[in-house]
Curated annotation (Swiss-Prot):
GO terms for biological process: translation. One of the primary rRNA binding proteins, this protein initially binds near the 5'-end of the 23S rRNA. It is important during the early stages of 50S assembly. It makes multiple contacts with different domains of the 23S rRNA in the assembled 50S subunit and ribosome. Forms part of the polypeptide exit tunnel. This is Large ribosomal subunit protein uL4. GO terms for molecular function: rRNA binding; structural constituent of ribosome. Pfam families: Ribosomal_L4. The keyword Cytoplasm does not apply. Part of the 50S ribosomal subunit. Residues 45-58 have a biased composition (Basic and acidic residues). It comes from the Bacteria. Residues 43-94 are annotated as: Disordered. InterPro entries: Ribosomal_uL4, Ribosomal_uL4-like, Ribosomal_uL4_dom_sf. It comes from Dechloromonas aromatica (strain RCB). The lineage of its organism: Bacteria, Pseudomonadati, Pseudomonadota, Betaproteobacteria, Rhodocyclales. Belongs to the universal ribosomal protein uL4 family. Keywords: Ribonucleoprotein, Ribosomal protein, RNA-binding, rRNA-binding.
Length: 207
């Protein structure tokens, strides 16, 4: 599979011979959906706490006598049927949202995403990317010269501090190391800018 490599002016400079296993795979929507949902589920933390009927504070006195009032039987105002009572199935911080995806499925799913990005011309490869100083203006000028304004994911083989600092104030741009690339980020951004060394890292991890 040949990928187009651009220069800093956004013009095609060369072709990169990439792995067909990683960039020439058919798109499997069901598999991609599964790994995206699993990734999001595994990122969840149990941060909600509700009380059941044994945990709410309430009197133990029976609200009214069992018979003779014409009203329904009631034994406690901590009942889930009552306002202020406990929940029937309360949320707990101990809930486990994790979903298991085996390595083979994950690799296949990432390959399907990268292949589809390449087919849709949303994957752009550059020889290397850096900025001279941690200035957002310098970074935005560089992206503009490459014609890559807008919703953009930038992936490098190693995190460049100047690149990271100059991009973190941009709401539509995210800079990641290759080993931090995840399915949610890859499908979310309109364009993905990848360095040649990052492509090699992808092939090493998922190829």
């Amino acid at each position: 599979m040949e990928l187009k490599v651009i220069n800093e002016q956004g013009q095609e400079a060369a072709k990169l011979q990439a792995s067909d296993v990683l960039f020439g795979r058919d798109f499997n929507e069901a598999l991609v959906h599964q790994i995206v949902v699993a990734y999001q589920a595994n990122a969840r933390s149990g941060d909600r706490q509700q009380k059941d009927r044994s945990e709410v504070r309430h009197t133990t006195t029976k609200p009214w006598r069992q018979k003779g009032t014409g009203r329904a039987r009631a034994g406690s105002n901590g009942s889930p049927l009552w306002r202020g009572g406990g929940r029937i199935f309360p949320n707990s911080p101990e809930e486990n949202f994790s979903q298991k995806v085996n390595k083979k499925m994950f690799r296949a799913g990432m390959a399907a995403i990268l292949s589809e990005l390449a087919r849709q011309d949303r994957l752009v490869v550059i020889d290397d990317l850096s900025v001279d100083a941690p200035k957002t203006k310098l970074f935005t000028q560089k992206l503009k010269s490459m014609g890559l304004e807008g919703n953009l994911l930038v992936i490098t083989d190693e995190l460049n501090e100047n690149l990271y600092l100059s991009s973190r104030n941009l709401p539509n741009v995210l800079v990641l190391e290759a080993q931090e690339a995840d399915p949610v980020s890859l499908v979310r951004f309109a364009k993905v800018l990848v360095t040649k060394n990052a492509v090699a890292k992808f092939e090493e991890m998922w190829g």
